[in-house]
UniProtKB/Swiss-Prot annotation:
Species per Swiss-Prot/TrEMBL record: Thermotoga neapolitana (strain ATCC 49049 / DSM 4359 / NBRC 107923 / NS-E)
InterPro entries per UniProt: CinA, CinA-like_C, CinA_C, CinA_KH, Competence-induced_CinA, MoaB/Mog-like_dom_sf, MoaB/Mog_dom
Family matches, as PANTHER family: NICOTINAMIDE-NUCLEOTIDE AMIDOHYDROLASE PNCC (PTHR13939), NMN AMIDOHYDROLASE-LIKE PROTEIN YFAY (PTHR13939:SF0)
Protein name: CinA-like protein
NCBIfam families: cinA_nterm, molyb_syn, PncC_domain, PRK00549.1
Family per record: Belongs to the CinA family.
Entry superkingdom: Bacteria
Any coiled-coil regions, as ranges: none
Length: 408
């Protein structure tokens, strides 16, 4: 198996100011392409430090990827450092300079004088087009090895790396399927599947869990065992299909919007503790406007009464965090928006506000189409975790409701 290494450049990474998402993305992608990543290092914006890391790692690997440091400013030094490490010249590419200037003109009336720096190309390098930003990447061949320079922003790096995947693929490329679940605990899922998963040795199994994507079951095998993996997935879905919400890169909100379209249903939401988080997740999906009418953030009791028609008597008897309150929220929302399906969330996200009968993490979610479906949850975690889990569980309830509707 070919070896690879990654150098992420940027003092902001060493200072903990931003997360190193590029390393995570590249490690996953390189494994699937058949590489063994032997090292990921982070280097600050210092020319000699970057050059020394290149000199140190290149003899050990078949592929070396550097990210960051390709901008136009004084501390963007990756081009210069790689050129120095390889003892190659930096050459100004006038055609590239013109292309970069044309891109910059679309967003700025004046072209910065330092933009020329981004048109410096290491001797012998092939330019990698950046479809999103102004900083092009570079690809070099060095004694049969590949050295790739990519910009730091993930929104630029990811599409540029995607354009290189065919070039980088090895005979040892992996085939991977990720199955995503939300309303089933990781331990329960593994127990359901242990006989299927662990009675074979051709597929590597890994489970991961978080409050955003739920439980992810990652199945990886070599390309030669692809058919076996496909058959294994079929067996898994026979046992756990009712809990599955998506596969691979699918997000819960994308699945819900698709199901709303398939069922020809519209949606409106009323939120209290989530403060618009559920609405935000839905509208992040392209095409959501076809099915999403809108949302109301009714954080105070006054707004719950004046906009959604929640009764004063209900709030006094049962409180804002109650089955009765969320049901009146969805009923009022339905009158207000005439949406086919209405969802309401009200809860105690903390850190204060809990009581013995309704501790922090108590959340009520109601889904109302023709009848109410109300569930009380007791989520753990900090304030943001409770809010996120509430919004995601509302989506999961919607998904299950729409799937059931599609079967009837």
């Amino acid at each position: 198996m070919k070896k690879a290494a990654i150098i992420t450049v940027g003092s902001e990474l060493l200072e903990g100011l931003i997360l190193n998402r590029n390393a995570q993305f590249l490690c996953q992608e390189l494994k699937n392409l058949g590489y063994r990543v032997i090292k990921v290092s982070t280097v600050g914006d210092h020319l000699e430090d970057i050059a020394e890391e290149v000199r140190s790692l290149l003899p050990e690997v078949h592929l070396l990827i550097l990210t960051g440091g390709l901008g136009p400013t004084k501390d963007d030094l990756t081009r210069e450092a790689v050129a120095k490490a390889l003892n190659r010249k930096l050459l100004l590419d006038y055609n590239l300079k013109t292309k970069i200037e044309e891109k910059v003109k679309k967003y700025h009336s004046k072209i910065p004088s330092n933009i020329e720096k981004q048109a410096l190309v290491i001797e012998g390098a092939k330019v990698i087009d950046n479809p999103v930003g102004s900083a092009p990447g570079q690809l070099l061949e060095v004694d049969g090895k590949k050295v790739i320079l990519l910009p730091g922003p993930p929104k630029e790096l990811i599409p540029m790396f995607e354009s290189l995947k065919e070039l980088l693929k090895t005979p040892h490329a992996f085939y991977q399927v990720v199955l995503k679940y939300y309303s089933i605990p990781e331990a329960v899922l593994e127990d359901l599947l242990k006989e299927i998963l662990y009675s074979q040795d051709r597929v590597e199994v890994a489970t991961m869990a978080d409050h955003v994507e739920g439980v992810r079951l990652r199945l990886t095998t070599s390309a030669e065992h692809r058919e076996f993996l496909d058959e294994l997935v079929e067996k898994i879905l026979e046992k756990t299909g009712e809990y599955l919400y998506g596969m691979n890169d699918e997000k819960m909100e994308e699945v819900v919007v698709r199901l709303l379209k398939e069922n020809k249903k519209t949606l409106a939401v009323a939120e209290s503790c989530t403060g618009g988080m559920l609405s935000s997740l839905v509208v992040n999906v392209p095409g959501a406007s076809d099915v999403f009418i809108g949302g109301v953030v009714a954080y105070s009791n006054e707004l719950k009464k004046s906009i959604l028609g929640v009764k004063e008597d209900t709030l006094r008897k049962y409180g804002a965090v109650s089955e009765q309150c969320v049901q009146e929220m969805t009923e009022g929302l339905k009158k207000l928006t005439e949406a086919d399906i209405c969802v309401a969330i009200s809860g105690i996200a903390g850190p204060s506000g809990g009581t013995p009968t309704k501790p922090v993490g108590t959340v009520f979610i109601d889904l109302f189409e023709q009848n109410h479906s109300t569930v009380r949850y007791n989520f753990s975690g900090d304030r943001n975790t409770i809010r996120t889990r509430s919004a995601m569980m509302a989506l999961e309830n919607l998904r299950k409701h729409l799937k059931e509707r599609g079967r009837s």
